[in-house]
Design a protein with these regions (language model features):
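Mid-to-C-terminal alpha-helical segments outside catalytic/metal-binding sites
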Residues: 1-3, 14-15, 20-52, 224-225, ...
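Active-site mouth loops of central-metabolism enzymes
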Residues: 25-35, 81-89, 117-123, 179, ...
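Active-site environment of divalent metal-dependent phosphoester hydrolases
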Residues: 10-13, 60-63, 88-91, 115-117, ...
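Active-site gating/metal-coordination segments in enzymes
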Residues: 51-52, 61-150, 157, 200-206
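Histidine-centered catalytic micro-motifs
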Residues: 2-12, 169-172
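Short, acidic/polar
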Residues: 34-44, 89-100, 185-186
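Conserved, mostly hydrophobic/aromatic
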Residues: 6, 45, 68, 99, ...
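Catalytic pocket-lining loop regions of alpha/beta-barrel enzymes
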Residues: 122-236, 284
Length: 284
């Protein structure tokens, strides 16, 4: 079985499901403007042999998870959801208590910059006001996908204080860069988190940070470094399909299937499926 640990649904801004009007996210970036539906994702998955995928609602669309959950219900067994919630909303403490009771809801996706009205928080991961939030998610067993970009080091205090909280580092903690080295500027900070057993990494978007054609050899050393530090049972494959501009969905999968010689068959089973199933408590 192959599980894709992240894709974004891009659906229209409608009166029934409006996007928030905060200045930082009132509309998506231009490259995201076209629709990407669950049906399109199913077609892409079928074409390369991916069995199921995790829907991660995009940040600029707000905290309305209803359409993602509806897609998971419509295509049962194919999709589940890592939803969004505003940690600064006064209603959030009560909502967290029942978060995982929502059918197909697996956890929460967090951004470090939180463009919430009336206060825009530039570094939510380091905000002392959210200590209650990390503690609640730890107590309730809610996994958190953390969009750290180049700020992996900001997870260190959270991991130290909350050893039973599952923290999933998104996209190898990379950022856009002119070179692979620039994109992986936070690599050492990410590796430093490997000592915490509940910290895992989404690894599949390495090709998007490469500046070479397939098989993207300029990022292989980083992928090997993650493998050596975290091990396959803490590596989750994903392609982030809506972000692909220089490579294809098939190439993102093929790289891990064929071109990383250090991976064993058991490693691939973990990376393609079992690690996501365990980290997100999403059994077959």
């Amino acid at each position: 079985m192959i599980t894709d640990a992240q894709f974004h649904m891009y659906l229209p801004d409608t009166s029934e499901h409006p996007w928030p009007r905060d200045p930082d996210r009132s509309k998506p970036p231009a490259k995201h403007a076209r629709s990407f539906t669950p049906e399109e994702m199913l077609g892409a998955m079928e074409a390369i042999g991916v069995d199921r995928a995790v829907i991660v609602p995009p940040g600029w669309a707000g905290e309305d998870n209803s359409r993602a959950l509806a897609a998971a219900a419509q295509y049962a067994g194919k999709f589940a959801v890592m939803g969004r919630i505003d940690p600064y909303d006064p209603a959030t403490p009560e909502r967290l208590e029942h978060w995982l009771e929502q059918p197909s809801m697996l956890g929460i996706r967090m951004s470090g910059k939180w463009p919430a009205t009336p206060t825009q928080v530039q570094d939510a991961f380091s905000d002392p006001a959210l200590e209650w939030y990390w503690a609640a998610c730890e107590r309730l067993g809610i996994p958190l996908m953390m969009l750290t970009r180049q700020f992996a080091s900001r997870l260190l205090p959270i991991a130290e204080r909350h050893p039973d909280l599952t923290l999933i580092i998104d996209h190898l903690s990379t950022q856009e860069g002119a070179t692979a080295a620039e994109a992986f500027a936070a690599f050492d900070d990410m590796i430093a988190l490997a000592r915490f057993p509940r910290v895992v990494v989404k690894v599949g978007n390495g090709p998007s940070r490469s500046r070479q054609p397939y098989p993207f050899e300029d990022v292989h050393r980083y992928l090997r470094g993650v493998y050596d530090a975290f091990g396959a049972p803490r590596m989750l494959w994903e392609a982030d399909i809506t972000q692909l501009t220089k490579n294809t969905y098939a190439e993102c999968l093929r790289l891990w299937q064929e071109d990383l010689s250090f991976l064993t068959a058991e490693d691939k089973d973990w990376i393609f499926h079992r690690a996501t199933a365990e980290a997100l408590n999403w059994p077959e």
